[in-house]
Amino acid sequence: MNFEKKAYWWEIGEALKPTQELDTLPIDTDFVVIGAGYAGLSAALTVARRGKSVIVVDGGMPGFGASTRNGGICSGQIRPSLSALRTNFGIDFANNVYSEGVDARYDLIKFCEDEKIDCQLQMTGRFTGAMSQSDYDKQCREADNLNEIIGHKAYMVKKQDQQNEINTNLFFGGMVREEIGGFHPGKFFSGLLRIAEKAGVSVSFNNKVTEILDRKTGGKSIVTSMGTINTGKVIVATNAYTGRKYNFTKFLRQRLVPTQSCIIVTEKLGIDAVKKYMPKLRMYGNTANIYSYFRPTPDRERILLGSRSFDRSEPSKKSVIYLKKNLVKIFPELIDCKVDYCWLGNVAFTKSQLPTVFQHNDIYYAAGFAGSGTVWARWLGKKAAEMAIGISNKPSVFYGPPPAKLPFYDGNPWFLPMINKYYSFKDWFKTKRT
């Protein structure tokens, strides 16, 4: 079994690193942003366009984390359903969350159009297949709830009609959300990086932040492996790649659970073959607890599928076999197709499974995008910057106190294998009952 252990999205003719490598760091700057992914660059761009000096510092290569390792599905969705949010947090908050998802998605589209980022963004819609009749019934109620909020276009597809959406007998019908789409994550990141640099953002990469110190005169000193930067304000946008090595990450890592996802991309199947399986070339998912997400690649020549990972540092044959098995469950005719690419990436969750924007000890944070960072990371990075600058734009519904700390936890998600087994059993039991 031969496959490339790297993201398919890296195979582009565009640079994924800054045009200039900094030999020295500025002594003073208005802002330091830690983390050079979608959230960090969006925050820095917002700051720079307000006339402030800003440098982004990243311990690795810019965008090397989730920003160029995701599935490229642009949903602006959150993990809890609208129904669950209304039950647990009240109707007003729940409706505001889903309304902000509409705003964030529209803002992404407008940003790509205004900045002329050719990232193959298409609002194709998404079909989510129901894994049981009870799941389909829940989707029916959720579609009704979603359509109460302006900007949502949800409708149900019965099992006998789903061949028009997806060429499979696995699902019990499903839900289509027309407002969702997808893009090429690598091309979007490359475009965002170029725009940020053009706006005056400096990016220092392969430069680890080791400490954040309070200055007696106000502001912070950012200690890095290349030197120290004095700054007025700090934005932390490290999310699922926060790590446990340095003390300054402790407050955030005790409130975030990083979870690993694994993605495969098939060999070239050809546009006709892909359309045979996915007639409307949408984004796709299912209602399993250990769910899969899948889509055509932007060139419509291959199929991408992602789900949970069994690995730590690099993809293994075990993960490829598991994901290929999931793909074949959906499309049995692909049993003999080859996998050309497989890679890993981290996503992060708060205890509430909601994204968060908050301030603590004069440091601003945007985190917890829960696997939907293609929309939320850029949007909430921008919102964190607006909050730090003091712009009076409409604040995010996610702005508030820091998320809850998890007990007996310091950033190492030791409990995830047990949770995965529990949800895998629930999925197995559900399919056996149906």
Mark where each language-model region is:
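Helical element adjacent to the flavin cofactor pocket in flavoenzyme catalytic cores
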Residues: 144-145, 169-232
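Active-site substrate-recognition segment that forms the wall
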Residues: 106, 114-122, 209-211, 227-361
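Dinucleotide-binding Rossmann-like beta1-alpha1 core, especially the glycine-rich loop
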Residues: 77-160
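Glycine-rich Rossmann-fold phosphate-binding loop(s) that bind the pyrophosphate
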Residues: 35-37, 59
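Glycine-rich FAD pyrophosphate-binding loop
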Residues: 48-69
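C-terminal catalytic lobe of FAD-dependent flavoproteins
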Residues: 309, 313-429
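Short beta-strand to alpha-helix junction loop
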Residues: 98-102, 130-138, 175-197, 204, ...
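Extreme N-terminal leader/targeting segments of oxidoreductases
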Residues: 1-31, 49
